[in-house]
């Protein structure tokens, strides 16, 4: 590779390394969050998910550039186009690393809420599961009775987030949700454009919580546990369908913790669920297990590289709920 190509790789890589050495809270407060807020205001003027346009364009380049390089190699009978492509790919990778370490990692590594004391005493966990079961059962018919469309559910989740935090996140439905599905994602916070993008084709019981969760990321709650907690608290301020969606997600995480602590108590409580709630509970289990194999490994590695405990980080919201209910 030419000298300028090496420089184009080394400079962003060095800056990315520097970002990891700087205080993450300072980077979050002075760079990442102000940038996301500014870009969010700009992209909020259109219903088109700008971030989706960008990653579709990048995906097209990933497919087309190797084909072009292969054609040029055959035409010119030279490996030079392939070497150029490798250099360009390395440059793009280094720039991507810089974008993540500057615009997302500081937010993900900075805790916004006080850390809860990890306490999962069986009695407290039993009580939490029973409370969430009762809440879900009391609201179980609301989602079927609601005439809200997917877009309206997303808007309602944004309104609930604004009611809780005083700020409305920028959450948009993906135009091609199946592409997110192929990646094992229900939604994504795209810090480059200040948007949260979610799959609008999700089941209605899933969509409000996913929208609120990704919206929490867009507002600066980078921890998965914090984003889950904020989403749950926000949805409890909304209409009954939103409260039901929030209760079902919280119930899933509480029951998942109970299954590890006391499998017999878990089995007893799942058998006590009504058919309607049990159906949605099973849907949530399938949803949480959708990412498998390589996709699950990549997600786990990404979370760990950003200072979290892998995929188990989502369930840590239960520690917050248990602490809130503690005497």
Protein language model features and the residues they cover:
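Alpha-helical transmembrane segments
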Residues: 5-19
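Transmembrane alpha-helices and immediately adjacent membrane-cytoplasm interface residues
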Residues: 60-68, 80-114
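Post-HExxH zinc-binding segment in Zn-dependent metallohydrolases
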Residues: 128-132, 222-263
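Pan-zinc metallopeptidase signature
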Residues: 273-327
